[in-house]
Amino acid sequence: PDNPYDGQGYDRLPNSVRLATYNTHRCEGWTQNSGTDRANYNNTAKVISLMDPDVIALQELDKNTTWHQTDQLQELADRTGMRPYYCKTISYRGGDYGIGILCKTAPKNTYAGDLPGTEARKFFLAEFDGYIFIATHFCHQSDENRQRSFEIITEYIAANYAAYTKPIYLAGDLNTSKLPAAALESWKIISTSANTFVNTSSPSRIDYVLVYTGNSPSYEVLRTAVPSYEEINVMTVSDHLPVLVDLKK
């Protein structure tokens, strides 16, 4: 059926929760030649603020490196008014590199777990009142590592949240346009099929929001999109596009 919210812009809907994911590319814009002090935190923060998520998973964040001698997630938190929760994945250029979450309300607890990769990877779980939100950035080189990453997260949920009945969401850059079939036995994609990695000769969808189906949660997707805004050209802010999902509260 047609989505009744299509064509209405991306304003927040009444009685809804907005989840999002965004690979920030170190806030450096869309080009691939990284370097020092190229970051534009105002641009990245503007996209996040226009999206107005309740919680957003962010990938590729420097913290006090030689490239960016600041806490990039804190820079975004300062500009958006959201709460930052950082998850270091590797030591990098004299500092840290990793993923994070920005949220409007503080989570009850957080947990960081290890995932496989030629470059070390993590999943970062945050429990809120109405749901669990897991941010991640999977290995970019190996289908096997990505499949194992799904297994590790699923096993962690089964071991630690067996009695949990609320929705559990997974959001991030999964670095593949084809998710492992085995993973889709426990997870359902609820985000848009639009391409998210586009400044390339072969655009693809590699950024997702999924819901865990193992606990048969009650949820209702109202809308999902790769948003665009008149106020800023999202194509130039990162080499990825942001993804949002609106759910009934």
Residue ranges and their predicted role:
Residues 18-24, 44-69, 133-136, 152-183, ...:
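Active-site beta-strand/loop signature of hydrolases that rely on acidic residues for catalysis
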Residues 12, 102-105, 125-130, 212-213, ...:
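Active-site beta-strand termini and strand-to-loop segments that position acidic
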Residues 1-79, 91-95, 239, 248-249:
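N-terminal, active-site-proximal structural segment of metallo-dependent hydrolase catalytic domains
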Residues 1-7, 112, 144, 158-169, ...:
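Metal-dependent phosphoester-hydrolase catalytic domains
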Residues 3-10, 60-132, 138, 220-227, ...:
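Structured beta-strand-rich core segments of catalytic domains in phosphoester-bond hydrolases
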Residues 27-33, 111-114, 137-146:
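Surface-exposed cleft-lining segments at the edges of enzyme active sites
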Residues 36-44, 86, 199, 228-231:
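N-terminal post-signal-peptidase region of extra-cytosolic proteins
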Residues 15-20, 96-98, 120-122, 129, ...:
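Residues that flank catalytic or metal-binding motifs in active/ligand-binding sites
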